[in-house]
Amino acid sequence: MSLSEARFHDLVDATQQALEDLFDESGMDLDMENSAGVLTVKFEGGAQLIFSRQEPLRQLWLADRSGGFHFDYDEESKKWVCEKSEELLGEMLERIVWERAGEKLDFDEI
């Protein structure tokens, strides 16, 4: 069953806030900007992650230099799941942040 528009926006807002909090608490040298529902995380060295919402598809999108990834929310697991690889958003972020910034962060709650 597809997410309602309101539920979708609530989930994306909560996810983006959790990401901001996690990055803020990490002590990493980075810049963040959240504007018009798009969260951009810029790492030292120029790498960046861009999180955006795709309302018509009810998806959370992640752009990274390795590509674009589209995530659907799974109500059963309460997690965002990549539509192609079925990798969880948190798992992918742990890998990407390690590759881009050399930092180990715990994204289990994402």
From Swiss-Prot:
Entry annotated with the keyword Hydrolase: no
InterPro entries noted in UniProt: CyaY, Frataxin/CyaY, Frataxin/CyaY_sf, Frataxin_CS
Keyword Iron: yes
GO cellular component annotations of the record: cytosol
PROSITE patterns referenced in this protein's UniProt entry, alphabetically: FRATAXIN_1, FRATAXIN_2
Molecular functions per Gene Ontology: ferric iron binding; ferrous iron binding
Any Pfam family: Frataxin_Cyay
Keywords attached to this entry: Iron, Metal-binding
Biological processes per GO annotation: iron-sulfur cluster assembly
Similarity remark: Belongs to the frataxin family.
Task of the protein: Involved in iron-sulfur (Fe-S) cluster assembly. May act as a regulator of Fe-S biogenesis.
Classification via PANTHER family: FRATAXIN, FRATAXIN, MITOCHONDRIAL
Name the UniProt record assigns to this protein: Iron-sulfur cluster assembly protein CyaY
